[in-house]
Amino acid sequence: MEESEQVLPLLTNPKDLTNPSYASSSSSSSEPRDETEDLLLPISDENEEEEEENSPIRQVALTVPTTDDPSLPVLTFRMWVLGTLSCILLSFLNQFFWYRTEPLTISAISAQIAVVPLGRLMAAKITDRVFFQGSKWQFTLNPGPFNVKEHVLITIFANAGAGSVYAIHVVTVVKAFYMKNITFFVSFIVIVTTQVLGFGWAGIFRKYLVEPAAMWWPANLVQVSLFRALHEKEERTKGGLTRTQFFVIAFVCSFAYYVFPGYLFQIMTSLSWVCWFFPSSVMAQQIGSGLHGLGVGAIGLDWSTISSYLGSPLASPWFATANVGVGFVLVIYVLVPICYWLDVYKAKTFPIFSSSLFSSQGSKYNITSIIDSNFHLDLPAYERQGPLYLCTFFAISYGVGFAALSATIMHVALFHGREIWEQSKESFKEKKLDVHARLMQRYKQVPEWWFWCILVTNVGATIFACEYYNDQLQLPWWGVLLACTVAIIFTLPIGIITAITNQAPGLNIITEYIIGYIYPGYPVANMCFKVYGYISMQQAITFLQDFKLGHYMKIPPRTMFMAQIVGTLISCFVYLTTAWWLMETIPNICDSVTNSVWTCPSDKVFYDASVIWGLIGPRRIFGDLGLYKSVNWFFLVGAIAPILVWLASRMFPRQEWIKLINMPVLISATSSMPPATAVNYTTWVLAGFLSGFVVFRYRPNLWQRYNYVLSGALDAGLAFMGVLLYMCLGLENVSLDWWGNELDGCPLASCPTAPGIIVEGCPLYT
């Protein structure tokens, strides 16, 4: 059995599969373009004579087209216009909603759908006149019908604006939480360098994470399915629906339905029925609360509850979903209850689930009192106030992060070490390619030196900024080089896990741990080290995922590279400008005491982490001076767990299910908590089971036609209705005050149960 087959559950003989054909609606009328010819390379006769092999991954074989039309124009006027507008609009809206108590993320799928009628309108109305005809500068604003390759590049622009720019956390925490100074220029340098640094790592690891068929990036299949539904002409089967018809129906239903959980009946976000039966029991509400407790029996009837933190369960392969589910059960339903009811780390003094920082008496820790005028830890003030405490779940979540780190390294070494070594050797000689890689050979690749130039220039600019503006950033030059070292070590193993399972173990904890031990008492330095070590790696994985999308849709790599660079730079500027405007114009933004809708929940978690790892330092919390030193044993647990699975797979080679146990995914299952909550997981796993196991196994034809299309329709309907509700009602603060909008209905879930601890609204235990 090949190495890739040891971890992939759904491999099959390619000859048993149907190969979906590619038929763009515009391919028949488009003429070859000079821009495309410049990106083409001849395909050897030897490759043309090879037997066509589809992808060994069944989901890819059923979803991705195996043909290409290189004559389709790509870098068109409408691509630049619609791509730039999509990037700007999504960047603004996502950052605008990011600071709100209930943040709304507008995915690239929204733009992916919205630009279709606009692109076709531009194709119908804009002149097709050829300017400077006969010269090397000739161009036209309208090269023909709106085609799928233009559409893919527009979506790449939209992807740049579809998520948050992580380095914005640094700016927000410094300005809104610590109330210190950081200039716009310095903020822009930090944001751009962290985003662009990922291109360097992406270039280094392309041959390992894009070209191999085993690195299939499940999330991309949602977009591939949507592109095909929007562009291919499909015959309607008797009694059935085309994918386009199905998408429209599902989109309308999702759009109309979200008015209930999004506005009229918000309790649908988390139906914690255990709390309804025990309205006066703290223990019952701790167990049953989907938002503030363990979420036993809790379920959400809201697509945003399902997909907001873990992504679409319809895009996750079942074995990965099962690993997440098992990891969630072990942590939330086994480890946390045992530690809480045994009062480990004074657990009963604090809520069972919280990201807040506490004093020994259960009150919120006064952070500002332990910071001196130089933005460093005031040690005498810290000793007067006493040590910082975490709720037991928060402490365990850090331990789980430690275990996930060592498990990732060990898992990749054991299950993919030979594969990585063989790939390294194959990069210097001819290798057998699948159909998608062979089709991409006709296009000129991005030269390695492009990536190296970006990497070296970016690292140099980062070192200069950190040294010249050290009073604002606090990070010394050696910290930048150390962060880059951490990123380059972990990009490949975490990239492999993500490319196979659609789940990414987090690296943020180890970056915080390293710099916190080496350079304690400097919170901004800790945050900067984290974004250069962690986010540059995350950006690399995002760029690699986009490269794989281009690989599936046969986009010229140099064109894809250009779109990624331009989209990233535009999104950085728009994100920062929007965040700066909000922080300058909204009084007390991120202040939860004011009952404002602008409470910045994710930035609060980032701020708490900067206090734990940067200001106070891991030595005083997890080291020899701390209360939680035993949490470090999780490193050993994480290293041992993959070895046990590997040994079991060798001892029982016929037990295929053993090879599907992915310890990095299983151990890091709860890494999104907080801000994710239990109900996000329970509902996500249920939806993933129905899609990835039940439908895929018993109705494979139905799954093939509609699964990924349904995922895109649910995302899009939610996003459009979410924006509409906010623009029409949210801006005017029009709300409904009734029991159906009381989220969760578990007011006692956050109460402590230790004797003598007084918290407003909670019963006093004696």
UniProtKB/Swiss-Prot annotation:
GO terms for cellular component: membrane. The keyword Glycoprotein does not apply. The keyword DNA-binding does not apply. Residues 1-58 are annotated as: Disordered. Pfam families: OPT. One of its GO terms (biological process) is protein transport. The chain crosses the membrane at residues 79-99, 104-124, 154-174, 184-204, 247-267, 287-307, 324-344, 390-410, 446-466, 477-497, 509-529, 561-581, 627-647, 676-696, 709-729. Its main location: membrane. It comes from the Eukaryota. Expressed in the major and the first-order veins and in the hydathodes of the leaves. In the roots, expressed in circular zones surrounding lateral root primordia and in some part of the root epidermis. Expressed also in the sepals and the cortical tissues of the stem, but not in the conducting bundles, the petals or the reproductive tissues. Residues 45-54 have a biased composition (Acidic residues). Disulfide bonds: none annotated. It is found in: Membrane. Keywords: Membrane, Peptide transport, Protein transport, Transmembrane, Transmembrane helix, Transport. It is a multi-pass membrane protein. InterPro entries: Oligpept_transpt (IPR004648), OPT (IPR004813). One of its GO terms (molecular function) is oligopeptide transmembrane transporter activity. NCBIfam families: ISP4_OPT, OPT_sfam. Involved in the translocation of tetra- and pentapeptides across the cellular membrane in an energy-dependent manner. May also transport cadmium complexes. Belongs to the oligopeptide OPT transporter (TC 2.A.67.1) family. This is Oligopeptide transporter 7. It comes from Arabidopsis thaliana (Mouse-ear cress). The lineage of its organism: Eukaryota, Viridiplantae, Streptophyta, Embryophyta, Tracheophyta.
